[in-house]
Amino acid sequence: MYQVLIVDDEPIVKIALRSMLDWGSLGFHICGTASNGQEALEMAERMHPDLIICDLKMPVMDGIDLIRTAKDRSMNCEFLVISNYEDFNYVRTALVLGASDYILKVSISPEELTTQLQKIK
């Protein structure tokens, strides 16, 4: 099973992502959730997730700094970015830093998320 850490400062988004799919049938397990990048880094160092699904705009540490710091620390995990933030430069930075892809929160669907997960797997 691929271990997944969900990182978003909006509780409703974390709940929606958890309930959107039958994660186990796709070969994934949600090992935890975090509310900001700093909390996610601490959890990732303990849990070693295979995938971190993260927002870009969060308090304390945003998604860009989370990806950058995780890569600097040689954490071996994939990143899938979800956000309402549509600024191309911000998204491009996440992709250049190594995010696998980017999904807009407003358009996320079970089908789109499943497609992204299958690409990562």
Please annotate each region the language model reported.
Residues 1-121:
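Alpha-helical/coil-rich non-catalytic "connector" segments in signaling and regulatory proteins
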